[in-house]
Amino acid sequence: MMGGRARLWTDRRGSAAAEMAMVAPLLIGIMFGSLQMGKFFWDEHQVLKAVRDGARYAARQSFASMPCGGTATGETQIKNVVRYGRAVVTGSDRPLLNYWTDPATVTVTIDCYANAGVDGARIYDGVYTARSNVPRVTVTASVPYTPLASIFGFNAGLTLNASSQATVFGL
């Protein structure tokens, strides 16, 4: 009987399989976490690019459509550029992020710079020379993040936030 036990403790067959069974859950967790982190950074980058494109689109609208302290005339189109990547959206268009379904997550605000400099000189020249106030548009998005683990019922409760500003030059 003693010989059988000693043989069992010194037998190395199957030890690699046992070690793999112990380490596999850790490796799978690390791989899933890496995928999740990559998806988070990708989605954050998509939101950053979207608000930047929305601010650029808004900056190219006419001065009349961007009243200081008011609401942009084409606010719906600006929000469409942010969420869909295009100003006019059809029924078959999909948002840049498949879970970005709420247009209220995008805000467009307009404020103005006073275009008065030192000794009567203007701060801004060119298209702004005759203007006393220069409109600046800010596009902000606050998107609730949907992680990969949401298919298992887990939700991290994270929000992707981005903001971009551009001075309106009314082309």
Where are these regions (language model features)?
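N-terminal leader/signal peptides at the extreme start of proteins
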Residues: 1-13
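Alpha-helical hydrophobic helix detector
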Residues: 16-36
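Alpha-helical membrane and juxtamembrane elements of multi-pass inner-membrane transport
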Residues: 12-15, 28, 76, 158
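Short, conserved structural patches
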Residues: 2-3, 44, 49-171
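A cross-family signal for key residues in well-ordered alpha-helices
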Residues: 24, 39, 48
